[in-house]
């Protein structure tokens, strides 16, 4: 339920706050007695940044009825408990950036590639294919979409399929796509995937209808 997602986000933000407080306390104590290190400072900065990011992009989003739906469907499709989902997301910033970009895109009603968020905004490729009602696709097709967007922005193109594969892996974990067994090779850019037309897919299709 959406209520359990709000509660889970609150629990995980409390955990992150504890870590940030502890890291800050450690740094301050070490600073006072002259034993502080670069690592102490880096740990404190990383922990406080993580907490702020989670509050701004997840906690605030789940309190908004419309935006909470992104996490609701993503968590439902991933078949994870909400707390586990959020903890995993915080350890995999690559995935979280994409989900957060998706949330922001739903708020604005459009999902496009952005030079301001080159990692998160790659999720546009997924939305483009859903909008075009494509049933099956290859990792090479995702790679091409990403490079078309980068070319339009006049920035360096991807040389290999790593970024395309990472986006597809996230979509697999979220229960949005599945690999077509025995069809193509990921290394050659010919591995085939198909969309799973579940609640999450339908939600995304509705959210970005032209």
Segments predicted by a language model, with ranges:
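A short, conserved structural fragment
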Residues: 172-184
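Short amphipathic alpha-helical interaction segments
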Residues: 155-173
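Short, amphipathic alpha-helical interaction segments positioned at domain boundaries
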Residues: 194-210
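Intrinsically disordered, low-complexity, charge-biased tails
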Residues: 1-4
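Minor-groove-contacting beta-hairpin "wing" of winged helix-turn-helix DNA-binding domains
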Residues: 184-196
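Short acidic, hydrophobic short linear motifs in intrinsically disordered regions
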Residues: 132-155
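Short, amphipathic alpha-helical "recognition" segments used to contact nucleic acids or chromatin
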Residues: 125-133
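Long, low-complexity, charged/polar intrinsically disordered regions in eukaryotic proteins
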Residues: 8-13, 21-122
């Amino acid at each position: 339920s959406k209520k359990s997602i709000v509660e889970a986000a609150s629990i995980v933000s409390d955990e992150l706050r504890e870590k940030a407080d502890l890291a800050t306390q450690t740094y301050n104590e070490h600073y006072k007695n002259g034993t502080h290190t670069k690592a102490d400072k880096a740990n404190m900065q990383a922990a406080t940044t993580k907490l702020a990011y989670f509050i701004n992009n997840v906690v605030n989003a789940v309190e908004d009825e419309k935006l909470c739906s992104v996490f609701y469907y993503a968590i439902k499709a991933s078949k994870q408990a909400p707390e586990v989902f959020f903890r995993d997301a915080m350890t995999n910033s690559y995935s979280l950036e994409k989900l957060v970009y998706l949330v922001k895109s739903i708020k604005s009603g459009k999902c496009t590639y952005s030079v301001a968020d080159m990692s998160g905004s790659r999720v546009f490729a997924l939305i483009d294919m859903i909008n075009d009602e494509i049933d099956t696709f290859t990792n090479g097709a995702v790679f091409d979409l990403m490079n078309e967007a980068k070319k339009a922005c006049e920035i360096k193109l991807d040389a290999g399929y790593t970024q395309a594969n990472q986006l597809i892996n996230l979509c697999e974990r979220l229960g949005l796509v599945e690999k077509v067994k025995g069809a193509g090779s990921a290394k050659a850019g010919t591995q085939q995937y198909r969309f799973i037309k579940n609640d999450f897919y339908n939600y995304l299709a509705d959210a970005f209808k032209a």
